[in-house]
Amino acid sequence: MCIRDRLGVEIQSNQGSWRLEDRYPMSETTEILWELGSAELSAAGGSNTIFPDANSGPVYETPPLEENLYFGGLPRLHVNVNTVTVGGQIYALLEDCDGSTCIHIGHAIMDLRYHEGGGQEQTWIPIFETINAKMEFFAIDAQIEEGHTLRISLASTGEDYLPASTSSIVEISEGSNSNLLIDIIQPGGKILFDPPACTHQYCLDWLEQ
């Protein structure tokens, strides 16, 4: 198949396969919404209180998938929270789990002073006022196998991140305003391809190690 004259984006999934898209994030997707604490994304551990210690916070997980799931682009997590002070941080880790074995497929992090997004710092009345943190994951392209689950864990910070400069206790609220949104890809009809293989002697020597 000749693809040299096609204008588009080459994308590699977390399973290693390559395909072509006209743009990224992709335009031909279907958005699905899972409510935190619902049957689709139920509580699986932890508590709804996030302390600034990187070790506390809620965990949510889907039931085992009934079919393979393909999604990509920029998943969103919109979550209602209350804080003790004007500040706080949420780190969201998204994982593909097969029983007790999980692999990292994406993450998001937000300084709650910017919970509406953008560069304008917001303010609110701590404890009494609920805010909705509109988080966006770093770009993902994931294939999740049938029978696996998706797990999302919330904490104050994650691996390779520093503690928040404005630490605060954060209380997560479940319900209709707290949702994980992902964009489903239909793999049928996509242009798949194998990238050129390296035949240099250095590559061949490395493969033989």
Model-derived features: positions:
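Short phosphate-coordinating micro-motif centered on Lys-Gly-acidic
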Residues: 6-16
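Extracytoplasmic low-complexity segments
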Residues: 21, 25-29, 34
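Low-complexity, intrinsically disordered regions enriched in charged/polar residues
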Residues: 5, 28, 104-106
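Intrinsically disordered, low-complexity Ser/Thr/Gly-rich stretches
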Residues: 35-209
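Short alpha-helical segments and helix-capping/turn motifs at coil-helix boundaries
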Residues: 17-21, 135-138
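Short, small-residue-biased leader/transition segments that mark boundaries at the very start
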Residues: 1-3
